[in-house]
């Protein structure tokens, strides 16, 4: 059964419009809208961020630029896997998404895509991604990919997200998994440097996502999601943001000696953006503690810049 449901196009008199002229234009527009809806289910911006960490990890593992074929396979497989996880997340969370203002325009709550079709789409993407990596890389990379999809959707989305304030922490492993997958695809094993990069992305997710939860606190509360900023005190939220921000920066610096020959090309930019990241984290928490108006999305965006610079430095250092 096709995942794309065609809608009849009629003229004002109620008669069917021919496949040419205005009817054909309308059909093309409908098709583009359907395709756009399926793409939206994959959350492309999240996919992009995951790939930012995957390629540098592969380059560090290889000690330079891996073969273009291997990079293409991992990028395609990784994109499909991340897309699959997001689609299945949208399917499981469709009851929540229709309650939250931030998400009610997503394809499922907006009824642009039928839930059954979204489920099939997500399962197909997951199957293709794992198969691709199993055939063209190795069992470890494929196994990690499958584990990440299952953990994200069945453990985090369906269970932990709805039941514990530590949901962001326990879900962090999924966001950091692409680092391990990329490394494993190159070497077939996981070195200490791979785990260090994993740690950077893992710890980074708390000071990245807590500000987002602060901004949409009322939205999460309306949906009954126990995000830490929704149910905990300002003091508790501030403490976790600062602890994990410091852990992120410290682990990124520990990665310097653990990396295979990484030098100041990695270390200096990482140190500079780490200081800025910590300054922004402390600024947000200080204002929140004083009861002043805060701009949590400032830290959210800075954290994205921080991670991008760190992994760009990993890639550049591996090349030189």
From Swiss-Prot:
Belongs to the UbiA prenyltransferase family. Protoheme IX farnesyltransferase subfamily. Signal peptide: none annotated. The gene is ctaB. This is Protoheme IX farnesyltransferase. It is a multi-pass membrane protein. Its main location: membrane. Its EC number is 2.5.1.141. Residues 1-24 are annotated as: Disordered. Keywords: Cell membrane, Heme biosynthesis, Membrane, Transferase, Transmembrane, Transmembrane helix. Converts heme B (protoheme IX) to heme O by substitution of the vinyl group on carbon 2 of heme B porphyrin ring with a hydroxyethyl farnesyl side group. It holds the Pfam family UbiA. The keyword Cell membrane applies. It comes from Salinispora tropica (strain ATCC BAA-916 / DSM 44818 / JCM 13857 / NBRC 105044 / CNB-440). It catalyses: heme b + (2E,6E)-farnesyl diphosphate + H2O = Fe(II)-heme o + diphosphate.
């Amino acid at each position: 059964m096709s995942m794309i449901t065609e809608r009849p196009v009629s003229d004002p008199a109620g008669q069917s419009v021919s496949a040419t002229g205005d009817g054909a234009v309308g059909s093309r527009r409908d098709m583009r809208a359907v395709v756009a809806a399926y793409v939206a289910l994959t959350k492309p911006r999240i996919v992009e961020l995951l790939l930012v960490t995957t390629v540098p990890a592969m380059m560090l593992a290889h000690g330079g630029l891996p073969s273009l074929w291997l990079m293409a396979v991992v990028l395609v497989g990784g994109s499909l896997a991340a897309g699959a996880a997001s689609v299945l997340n949208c399917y499981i969370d469709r009851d929540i998404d229709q309650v939250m203002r931030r998400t009610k325009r997503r394809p499922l709550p907006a009824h642009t895509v039928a839930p059954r079709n979204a489920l099939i789409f997500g399962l197909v993407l997951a199957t293709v991604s794992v198969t691709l990596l199993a055939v063209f890389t190795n069992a470890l990379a494929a196994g990690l990919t499958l584990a990440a999809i299952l953990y994200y959707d069945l453990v985090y989305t369906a269970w932990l997200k709805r039941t514990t304030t530590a949901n962001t922490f326990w879900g962090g492993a999924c966001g950091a998994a692409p680092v391990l997958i990329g490394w494993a695809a190159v070497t077939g094993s996981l070195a200490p440097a791979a785990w260090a990069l994993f740690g950077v992305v893992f710890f980074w997710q708390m000071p990245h996502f807590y500000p987002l939860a602060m901004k949409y606190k009322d939205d999460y509360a309306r949906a009954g999601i126990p995000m830490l900023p929704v149910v905990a005190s300002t003091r508790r939220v501030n403490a976790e943001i600062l602890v994990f921000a410091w852990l992120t920066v410290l682990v990124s610096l520990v990665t310097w000696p653990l990396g295979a020959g990484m030098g100041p090309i990695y270390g200096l930019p990482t140190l500079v953006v780490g200081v800025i990241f910590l300054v922004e984290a402390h600024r947000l928490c200080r204002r929140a503690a004083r009861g002043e108006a805060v701009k949590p999305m400032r830290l959210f965006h800075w954290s994205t810049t921080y991670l991008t610079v760190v992994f760009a430095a990993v890639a550049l250092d591996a090349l030189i």
